């Protein structure tokens, strides 16, 4: 059994027109045993910037805390909010430092540039190799199912409501076909002037 599927979990980000969305499931379990249904996998890293972490639950929390520490240092030193691309480099450095005994988590970053409000999404593997795309990124135990749903439903230049509907349908239908993710989904829609957070009900089995 892979360490990456020990706790299960799924995270996804999608790009729209002047907006991005990031979604994650809410399950924390140990293989088939369910522990809790409100586990946090998406963490704020700025006013319009979020990171989603799927993988081993202990490493999800460790990476989130260490990243927050580095982010606070960066903002104190630079006196400004971090750009999404810079955060990607910061995460890549953090993960690559531990490449011989890696953090078992594959991050997904979604946000808007603090000055230009240009949408940005990317994913990284567990040793910090980044992949920046213009459509969607996925991470977690049901990544094949998520890729299938996203390839079918995603279209360019979606408005925030359309983007929410698309990411929600993709996420809910993907986690329904995975035994170790699900138990509800949390979705953040990031726009220039507001962030909308919605919690979706899903199958609880």
From Swiss-Prot:
It is found in: Cytoplasm; Nucleus. GO terms for cellular component: cytoplasm; cytosol; nucleus; proteasome complex; proteasome core complex; proteasome core complex, beta-subunit complex. Keywords: Acetylation, Cytoplasm, Nucleus, Proteasome. PROSITE patterns: PROTEASOME_BETA_1 (PS00854), PROTEASOME_BETA_2 (PS51476). One of its GO terms (biological process) is proteasome-mediated ubiquitin-dependent protein catabolic process. The modification N-acetylserine is found at residue 2. Belongs to the peptidase T1B family. PANTHER family: METALLOPROTEASE TLDD, PROTEASOME SUBUNIT BETA TYPE-3. Non-catalytic component of the 20S core proteasome complex involved in the proteolytic degradation of most intracellular proteins. This complex plays numerous essential roles within the cell by associating with different regulatory particles. Associated with two 19S regulatory particles, forms the 26S proteasome and thus participates in the ATP-dependent degradation of ubiquitinated proteins. This is Proteasome subunit beta type-3. It comes from Rattus norvegicus (Rat).
């Amino acid at each position: 059994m892979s360490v990456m599927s020990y706790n299960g979990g799924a995270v996804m980000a999608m790009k729209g027109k002047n907006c991005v969305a990031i979604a994650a499931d809410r399950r924390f379990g140990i293989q088939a045993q369910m522990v809790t249904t409100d586990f946090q996998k998406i963490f704020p890293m700025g006013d319009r910037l979020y990171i989603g972490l799927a993988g081993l639950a202990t490493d999800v929390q460790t990476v989130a805390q260490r990243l927050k520490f580095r982010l606070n240092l960066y903002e104190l030193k630079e006196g400004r909010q971090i750009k999404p691309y810079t955060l990607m480099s910061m995460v890549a450095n953090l993960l690559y430092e531990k490449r011989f005994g890696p953090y078992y988590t594959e991050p997904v970053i979604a946000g808007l540039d603090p000055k230009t409000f240009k949408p940005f999404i990317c994913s990284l593997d567990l040793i910090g190799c980044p992949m920046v795309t213009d459509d969607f990124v996925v991470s977690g135990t049901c990544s094949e199912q998520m890729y299938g749903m996203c390839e079918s439903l995603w279209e360019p230049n979606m408005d925030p409501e359309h983007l929410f509907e698309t990411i929600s349908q993709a996420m809910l239908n993907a986690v329904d076909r995975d035994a170790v993710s699900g138990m509800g989904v949390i979705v953040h829609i990031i726009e220039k002037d507001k962030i909308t957070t919605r919690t979706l009900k899903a199958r609880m089995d």
